[in-house]
């Protein structure tokens, strides 16, 4: 019952998508119908030389007339987009996201035609929700003679629309007479959006129907309403229209509205990273070529032998809550067992420590409360969970800003090779590899990059040992590798970890470990930073300075700590921080390039005179070279990984909302808010005791001050 040209186009369209018209007959009929309606919509409509529209049905019209509608539907995709682009270029109309069906030269708008076997308003809302464009006009016809169009503007005269409705009625009758109509009517799917295809049945369906707001008869009816809900205009009105109980007063947000975040009081916060950062000291060997080079234990022993200033250890700063003699004994045991290894003919590849009382204590062996089967205790009358104490509030301490500043600095070694950031899966475009190389050059010597490689090494070694030697107290050297300025390889030892029992079944099961790390930092200078550590003095180191050699005490920072499979997995993937900060830099380059309409990568990295905003400090907006920007972004990403915590997650998510409001104010968008107090509460409940979160909050306050000046 369809026009032969329509049939041919519909077959072609389906084949383009790999569908068979003979199998998917309902879809085929729907495509044919839609094509016919589009052609009929444009038939006989012309525009005369004065731009007036007219209808000409008979033979030879005046040659000066121009077709009123451009037909886009029915062309192959490439051609269709070419037509759309040329219309947009000549008329200045916005380019639509989806291919429309027609363009109306009289009204200067694209038209989306819909033909539905369901109710027109439901189909209309689905279409509107899909194309989400104010500019494209929508016109829906149904087989029952109903129609619906944007703003009730039907574009065509009554008679032309009646022709279309009659044709649809005829198609329906012809299908019915062949027994095809029922199947065709029921086969219509909504516009393909994820929600539409998700069928809800059974109990869920009954629950959905029971929980509809008042005045809605069915879930579809409610969905159509929600999809058609345009979130512009006056919010108060929308809210009151939604429910009588809601009354949100929208308060204007002005420069004087926001107050600074309240940072907690209390003792200064303490270091909580899994390994030392700026305070770490390395024992290093250059151009390692010893036997077994690359085996951690061999490398560690070789590094230990480069130092000659060992002395009888003593406690320089006790751990307030711990048994300090045990920490001392643990270090002495490490020295003794390393000595034992050397006395053997063949050095083993791994070293398991003797399970001495000091190590059992430090690793919490037998400390876990005994597990009892629930069946045996469910009759206990006062069975309850432990009361856990609220975390104690801590105030911001200056050390965390110093840690961050140090992480942004350059070291005298390179910590990654050029190809460290992502392997090339495909031949990477020239620009992308150029950006990557420039970026790598800026960050390869950065201290944050050292932290990445150190973190990857420690987490990999610890996860390996946790799986391979579950019951053993394995000694794991903390090692990193780098290249000196002259390109010589270097192996560094930061200290040791001793791993506790590690039967890790779940991702969150904890493995305890004791870390022992070398340092030249005297813990008595900032004792609050080292609250969780017992610090031993273990030797004297000769340092070359401008005034000659000086001897400085060498310390060992010892603490018990713990981690889990999931944390180690993320620790092993710390190289992602390089990628994250590279992407942030790329978006800055993209922004520059789009303004200048050419790729600005080279200028961006090579123009040394230009400065860029790095961040806000109490002094104002800090600026620096592009290299400094790269390193600062990298350091932020690395600290987010090193100091990951629920407090950070909450603070980032909640403070971002306030940030967006302030930015909207800066851009003169006149933002309004309701329950700003609730937002402040949500942000401030994350400010408890975490050094990195507290530092970010104080940066946020600096930003508020300058943004609102």
From Swiss-Prot:
Enzyme class, broadest EC rank: hydrolase
InterPro entries, sorted: INFV_PA (IPR037534), PA/PA-X (IPR001009), PA/PA-X_sf (IPR038372)
Main location: host cell
Keywords annotated in UniProt: Cap snatching, Endonuclease, Eukaryotic host gene expression shutoff by virus, Eukaryotic host transcription shutoff by virus, Host cytoplasm, Host gene expression shutoff by virus, Host nucleus, Host-virus interaction, Hydrolase, Inhibition of host RNA polymerase II by virus, Manganese, Metal-binding, Nuclease, Phosphoprotein
Motif (Nuclear localization signal 2 (NLS2)): 177-240
The record's account of how the chain is modified after translation: Phosphorylated on serines and threonines by host kinases, including human casein kinase II.
Gene Ontology annotations for the cellular component aspect, listed alphabetically: host cell cytoplasm; host cell nucleus
GO biological process, alphabetically ordered: cap snatching; symbiont-mediated suppression of host gene expression; symbiont-mediated suppression of host mRNA transcription via inhibition of RNA polymerase II activity; viral RNA genome replication; viral translational frameshifting
Cofactor: Mn(2+)
Chain's role: Plays an essential role in viral RNA transcription and replication by forming the heterotrimeric polymerase complex together with PB1 and PB2 subunits. The complex transcribes viral mRNAs by using a unique mechanism called cap-snatching. It consists in the hijacking and cleavage of host capped pre-mRNAs. These short capped RNAs are then used as primers for viral mRNAs. The PB2 subunit is responsible for the binding of the 5' cap of cellular pre-mRNAs which are subsequently cleaved after 10-13 nucleotides by the PA subunit that carries the endonuclease activity.
Family of this protein: Belongs to the influenza viruses PA family.
Protein name, as recorded: Polymerase acidic protein
Source organism of the structure: Influenza A virus (strain A/Chicken/Shantou/4231/2003 H5N1 genotype V)
